[in-house]
Amino acid sequence: MNKHILEKDVQQFIKANREKSPTEIALKKSPFPNVSSAELASQIDGWQRSVKKLPTWAYSEGIYYPDKINLEQCSSEHTALIKQTLIAKGSRVIDLTGGFSVDSCYIAQEADEVIHCELNEKLSEIVAYNATILRVPNLICKATDGIELLKQSEDDAFDYIYVDPSRRVNQGKVFLLEDCEPNIVANQELFFSKSRYIISKLSPLLDISTALSSLKHVRYVYVISLDNDCKELLFIQERGFEGETKIHAIRLFADQIQTFEFTYDAERSAMSRFSEPQDYLYDADVAITKAGAFKSIGKAFGLSKIHQHSHLYTSENFFPEFPGRVFQIQQVLPYSALKKNNPFVQANIATRNFPDKVDLIRKKYKIKDGG
């Protein structure tokens, strides 16, 4: 961490040039003897990456930005807010995998103390400094291995363990928990000896059912999406819990949260109805489909599926609160009709469980994108 970057004239330069191309800044000579043009470009790039993802950081004076990869890997403030809601007031929390501390800072709004463990000493120093700027005095930064610190702690030293394991390099196409560091499957007994709750942030590539077979005492699974893009999975384990896991599919918006809850037992027992397309077509959000609520969502809204494997739904009724996209059906045509008389010069095209891909349809029938 180059503390000269925090000097007033350097900060003024960064603020005055933060809308410019970082590459342009990097290619020019630095006006400061102790701060390189590459460092200036890195800070400007960090601000630009944070404007939408981390507005609290971006619009706080004097924030020090880490390497690009740390910003790419960190949570957004949208998803960090979900973790905050999981924490009881007055708790003691340890974040085993630290990073840029977005989740830790939000968790610290509820907890009495959050121990932030980060092996990268430079990043740990940056986080500790930024915590003073953001006024998070209960974030305690330790430049150390979180697992080793946990082993040295007393039993029940914490109320929550938070962990965001990273996938080890050179693994196969199948995403397995055992391929991650730290290995939360192998360390479950250690974790439960130190804390009642374990909150694991996991990749949306992970198969939820496979993870549930590897993890013990899972009370909740959260599937979180933003703009119909699945961002992360949260597994909440509670020591001694033996009940049925509840699945929460969560859609995040700029100013609200939409949640759909179900269980896999209820999903297995639900029966789907089928019909031809009616007045409205319903396309469930990715949080719903990733969670696996294919029959539960149809049952909840009284919808019929148009095909067993397409996961598109239809109804005579309009439900504005449906978690996904809703289209009013104007006309239903057989695909073969396009060969005889194609009425579309320009259109948005989407397919489900269909042999021809979108690009092929556009090429075959000369349909431009948009509509």
Descriptions of predicted regions:
Residues M1-G371:
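SAM-dependent transferase fold signal centered on methyltransferase-like domains
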